[in-house]
């Protein structure tokens, strides 16, 4: 679906297209990566986004390679608690601990509302191509440290055990700022506070419900 539906769109729709790809296309690489850096997708999801980008390369499309999302969009949408910041805050509150696998992996973080802001900012601009979109690069262990500052009762447990997600990369979003004048502004602390308020105030009855995890939600309906 991620690629073939985009192929149909590119072939049959000639107006403005805004496509949300992912920085996961970079996989695991050293250094600060920009849009000219080589790609190294490590999952079927990332590979499907690479293929979709290829289908759109000659269309009237702006393609955002999104960083790792965090935070809450509004009080009505389905909340995702399977994102690294959101799940660590939730675990800190409900279990009193954060389990960090390794912790030295880098992630380019991006608040979900900055995705909407970027789309609105560029929707009417006659700009096409691929653009990284993130706020700031963080190591996983530094994310955990920031959460413990908010929730001092929580403990960080680190383990050398290899995690199934081997992504590790930092990106630059300078191209987006130079060409479109947009820069993500919502910081990590804001997102931590949002998830903290959501969980601490028990606005979610069961934080372990499958609806709050994309993978679990799809598997419940037989989609893998």
Q: For the regions a protein language model found, what residue spans apply to each?
A:
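Conserved Rossmann-fold NAD(P)-dependent oxidoreductase catalytic core, especially the SDR/UDP-sugar
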Residues: 7-44, 62
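Structural signature of the Rossmann-like NAD(P)-dependent dehydrogenase/reductase core
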Residues: 16-19, 62-68, 99, 108-109, ...
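Flexible, glycine-rich beta-alpha linker
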Residues: 26-27, 43-44, 65-83
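Short glycine/proline-enriched coil/turn segments at helix->beta-strand junctions
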Residues: 11-17, 57-61, 124-128, 149-153
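Active-site Tyr-X1-5-Lys
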Residues: 28-31, 40-67, 90-94
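C-terminal substrate-binding subdomain of Rossmann-fold SDR/epimerase-dehydratase oxidoreductases
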Residues: 95-96, 100-224
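Hydrophobic alpha-helix immediately C-terminal to the catalytic Tyr-X-X-X-Lys motif of short-chain
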Residues: 51, 55, 84, 88, ...
């Amino acid at each position: 679906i991620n690629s073939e539906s985009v192929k149909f769109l590119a072939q049959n729709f000639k107006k403005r297209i805004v496509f949300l790809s992912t920085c996961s296309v970079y996989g695991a690489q050293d250094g600060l990566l920009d849009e000219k850096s080589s790609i190294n997708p490590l999952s079927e999801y990332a590979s499907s986004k690479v293929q979709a980008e290829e289908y759109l390369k000659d269309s009237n499309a702006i393609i955002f390679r999104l960083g790792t999302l965090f935070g809450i969009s509004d009080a009505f949408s389905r909340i995702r608690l399977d994102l690294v910041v959101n799940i660590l805050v939730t675990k800190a509150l409900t279990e009193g601990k954060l389990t960090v696998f390794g912790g030295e992996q880098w992630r380019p973080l991006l608040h979900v509302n900055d995705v909407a802001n970027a789309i609105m900012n560029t929707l009417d601009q006659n700009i096409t191509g691929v653009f990284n979109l993130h706020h700031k690069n963080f190591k996983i262990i530094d994310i955990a440290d920031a959460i413990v500052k908010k929730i001092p009762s929580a403990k960080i447990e680190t383990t050398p055990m290899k995690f199934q997600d081997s992504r590790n990369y930092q990106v630059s979003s300078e191209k987006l700022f130079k060409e479109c004048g947009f820069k993500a502004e919502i910081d990590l602390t804001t997102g931590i506070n949002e998830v903290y308020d959501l969980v601490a105030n028990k606005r979610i009855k069961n934080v372990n419900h499958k609806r709050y995890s994309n993978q679990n939600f799809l598997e419940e309906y037989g989609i893998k």
